[in-house]
Amino acid sequence: MTKEGKLKLFSTYTIYGMTAEKFSNGRSNIEVVKVMLDSGIKIIQYREKYKSLKEKYKECLEIRKLTEDYEALLIVNDHADLCQMVGADGVHLGQEDLPADEVRKLLGDKFIIGVTTHTKDQVLKAKEDGADYVGLGPVFASFTKDNPHPPIGLEMVKWAAENSPLPFVAIGGIKEHNLKEVLASGARCICAVTEIVGADDIRKKIESLFKILKSFERS
């Protein structure tokens, strides 16, 4: 798949999957990713804050193989070096990570670069720095990070839907019960981290989320 083809995924009504072993009720990242892929998720971000770099490398290699088998994308959180080493499709950078323009010099044009954003200025700066997409959030209160940013709210989602120069992934506190609000505000690609990884039945939860997404796609 070309880079252009990969980036089209970020503008469709779809789920951006993300690992979060801390919230996975004893299930490993590998187990969860297998279910995500088997349930139709085509973008996986490997995010792991509590393991050594060597452990992350080993897991990433295994997840890369899985994503290739399912013709899905692998985005590595934070680590441009790990992204290169495992042959991932791209890297996702936080506001405290290396600047996107410098990472672009390191990785070249073929890799996807995403940037976490909370404000209009950060979205515009990400475009200026050569990012390919942004993560926009947290839309609602979220507890997956140690020091979470205050919720940006649905008004920011509406602004991004109308004005963002880049595709965006709505993230943060998104649940099955509020997903329709997020989509009605203009989001298409969404990430519901704990709603998925913490579900008793991950496959069933993903099916429910996709059902809502498809209802908006048809409307």
Swiss-Prot record:
Pathway: Cofactor biosynthesis; thiamine diphosphate biosynthesis; thiamine phosphate from 4-amino-2-methyl-5-diphosphomethylpyrimidine and 4-methyl-5-(2-phosphoethyl)-thiazole: step 1/1. Pfam families: TMP-TENI (PF02581). 4-amino-2-methyl-5-(diphosphooxymethyl)pyrimidine binds at residues 45-49, 77, 116, 145. It catalyses: 2-[(2R,5Z)-2-carboxy-4-methylthiazol-5(2H)-ylidene]ethyl phosphate + 4-amino-2-methyl-5-(diphosphooxymethyl)pyrimidine + 2 H(+) = thiamine phosphate + CO2 + diphosphate; 2-(2-carboxy-4-methylthiazol-5-yl)ethyl phosphate + 4-amino-2-methyl-5-(diphosphooxymethyl)pyrimidine + 2 H(+) = thiamine phosphate + CO2 + diphosphate; 4-methyl-5-(2-phosphooxyethyl)-thiazole + 4-amino-2-methyl-5-(diphosphooxymethyl)pyrimidine + H(+) = thiamine phosphate + diphosphate. Its cofactor is Mg(2+). It is an enzyme of class 2 (transferase). Binds 1 Mg(2+) ion per subunit. Keywords: Magnesium, Metal-binding, Thiamine biosynthesis, Transferase. Its EC number is 2.5.1.3. GO terms for biological process: thiamine biosynthetic process; thiamine diphosphate biosynthetic process. Mg(2+) binds at residues 78, 97. One of its GO terms (molecular function) is thiamine-phosphate diphosphorylase activity. GO terms for cellular component: cytoplasm. Gene3D superfamilies: Aldolase class I. 2-[(2R,5Z)-2-carboxy-4-methylthiazol-5(2H)-ylidene]ethyl phosphate binds at residues 142-144, 173, 193-194. Condenses 4-methyl-5-(beta-hydroxyethyl)thiazole monophosphate (THZ-P) and 2-methyl-4-amino-5-hydroxymethyl pyrimidine pyrophosphate (HMP-PP) to form thiamine monophosphate (TMP). This is Thiamine-phosphate synthase. It comes from Caldicellulosiruptor bescii (strain ATCC BAA-1888 / DSM 6725 / KCTC 15123 / Z-1320) (Anaerocellum thermophilum). The gene is thiE.
